[in-house]
């Protein structure tokens, strides 16, 4: 078994020039050629940013609606009340509630990928913050998931909204599609993501903003990208 895995990886590595930082177009082409799993692998971008997340003014966080989605069916939960619950249901939310939903979450219900809430429901959401937070599900105004425009937020989530946040080491990871996507769709999704991250560059960040960049599939080695080309995307 180990020998098979080694041979598979060896074959994949042979397709990559390790000392080369690929341009976006060629990088996408190479990463698609690495698809070898028996399922439709996710394409992921990893960026190392020149920020220090220990400083609040250098925390890069936001959301982007990818033009071609992620290829994943997203289940959305909404905390709202009265007419806003109706708006959520009409927009296609999978789970809608208030205190009752918070109780279900306390009892172990986590069958959704994104949580949206109206501002007046954040006190209720706060009761399950210790459960949602570590899973990256806590609603936040910066990602458009705390809003009165519930219909738009649900629509964005269903259309392929990706929420991202720099980690403690300055890295951002985000899915931008599936291996089965045409190259052009993966490229356009990546450009939209990078454009959004570039717009969020903190004014206090010094030096090179995107230090390193890579593209990979769920089961593949990573392909290095030209960080300067990505920084030039506006």
From Swiss-Prot:
An example Gene Ontology biological process: regulation of translation
Mutation effect (residue 155 to T): In strain: Hp921023
SS bond list: none
CDD domains xrefs: Ribosomal_L1
GO CC field: cytosolic large ribosomal subunit
Keywords: Antibiotic, Antimicrobial, Repressor, Ribonucleoprotein, Ribosomal protein, RNA-binding, rRNA-binding, Translation regulation, tRNA-binding
SUPFAM superfamilies: Ribosomal protein L1 (SSF56808)
One example GO MF annotation: tRNA binding
InterPro entries (UniProt xref): Ribosom_uL1_bac-type, Ribosomal_uL1, Ribosomal_uL1-like, Ribosomal_uL1/biogenesis, Ribosomal_uL1_3-a/b-sand, Ribosomal_uL1_CS
The UniProt record lists the keyword tRNA-binding: yes
Subunit structure: Part of the 50S ribosomal subunit.
Function: Binds directly to 23S rRNA. The L1 stalk is quite mobile in the ribosome, and is involved in E site tRNA release.
Family (UniProt): Belongs to the universal ribosomal protein uL1 family.
Miscellaneous comment: The antimicrobial peptide HP (2-20) forms a short alpha-helix. Increasing the amphiphilicity of the helix increases its antimicrobial activities.
Protein's UniProt name: Large ribosomal subunit protein uL1
Organism: Helicobacter pylori (strain ATCC 700392 / 26695) (Campylobacter pylori)
Encoding gene per record: rplA
């Amino acid at each position: 078994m180990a020998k098979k895995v080694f041979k598979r990886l060896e074959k994949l590595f042979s397709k990559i020039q390790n000392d080369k930082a690929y341009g976006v177009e060629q990088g996408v082409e190479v990463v698609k050629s690495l698809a070898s799993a028996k399922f439709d692998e996710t394409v992921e971008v990893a960026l190392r940013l020149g920020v220090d997340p220990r400083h609040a003014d250098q925390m890069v966080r936001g959301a982007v609606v990818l033009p071609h989605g992620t290829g994943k069916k997203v289940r959305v939960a909404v905390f709202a009340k009265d007419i806003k619950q109706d708006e959520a249901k009409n927009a296609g939310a999978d789970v809608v509630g208030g205190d009752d939903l918070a109780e279900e979450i306390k009892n172990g219900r986590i069958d959704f990928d994104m949580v949206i809430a109206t501002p007046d429901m954040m006190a209720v959401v706060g009761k399950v913050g210790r459960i949602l937070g570590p899973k990256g599900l806590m609603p936040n105004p910066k990602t458009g998931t705390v809003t009165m425009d519930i219909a738009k937020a649900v629509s964005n989530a269903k259309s392929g909204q990706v929420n991202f946040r720099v980690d403690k080491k300055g890295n951002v990871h985000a899915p931008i599609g599936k291996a089965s996507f045409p190259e052009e769709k993966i490229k356009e999704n990546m450009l939209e993501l990078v454009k959004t991250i570039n717009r969020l560059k903190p004014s206090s960040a010094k030096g090179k903003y995107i230090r390193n960049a890579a593209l990979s599939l769920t089961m593949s080695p990573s392909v290095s990208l030209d960080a300067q080309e990505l920084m030039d995307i506006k």
